[in-house]
């Protein structure tokens, strides 16, 4: 087994571990909206890691381009998500999802 396949294997194990931790964070803690946002960002990090690993394995630059666009979208998503959380906190004085029901008038 050469060194490139070992590094790809380790990278994929790391990426899978990140993805499983983020899914566990979403499943275990559904009440805190900030932890949900962080878990979603961790999931996007796992996907970015996969893109970089496979792009490096096939010597393609497009993987890096995809990662750049995913990071830009993730930054915009985080900014909008945090702005919504701050607005909800200012109005309701809580970020606990079980106490928030914005569909009721």
From Swiss-Prot:
The chain crosses the membrane at residues 8-28, 33-53, 65-85. The keyword Cell inner membrane applies. It catalyses: a quinone + NADH + 5 H(+)(in) = a quinol + NAD(+) + 4 H(+)(out). One of its GO terms (molecular function) is NADH:ubiquinone reductase (non-electrogenic) activity. Keywords: Cell inner membrane, Cell membrane, Membrane, NAD, Quinone, Translocase, Transmembrane, Transmembrane helix, Transport, Ubiquinone. The keyword DNA-binding does not apply. Its EC number is 7.1.1.-. One of its GO terms (biological process) is ATP synthesis coupled electron transport. It is a multi-pass membrane protein. One of its GO terms (cellular component) is plasma membrane. It holds the Pfam family Oxidored_q2. Belongs to the complex I subunit 4L family. HAMAP family: NDH1_NuoK. NDH-1 is composed of 14 different subunits. Subunits NuoA, H, J, K, L, M, N constitute the membrane sector of the complex. NDH-1 shuttles electrons from NADH, via FMN and iron-sulfur (Fe-S) centers, to quinones in the respiratory chain. The immediate electron acceptor for the enzyme in this species is believed to be ubiquinone. Couples the redox reaction to proton translocation (for every two electrons transferred, four hydrogen ions are translocated across the cytoplasmic membrane), and thus conserves the redox energy in a proton gradient. PANTHER family: NADH-UBIQUINONE OXIDOREDUCTASE CHAIN 4L, NADH-UBIQUINONE OXIDOREDUCTASE SUBUNIT ND4L. This is NADH-quinone oxidoreductase subunit K. It comes from Francisella tularensis subsp. holarctica (strain LVS).
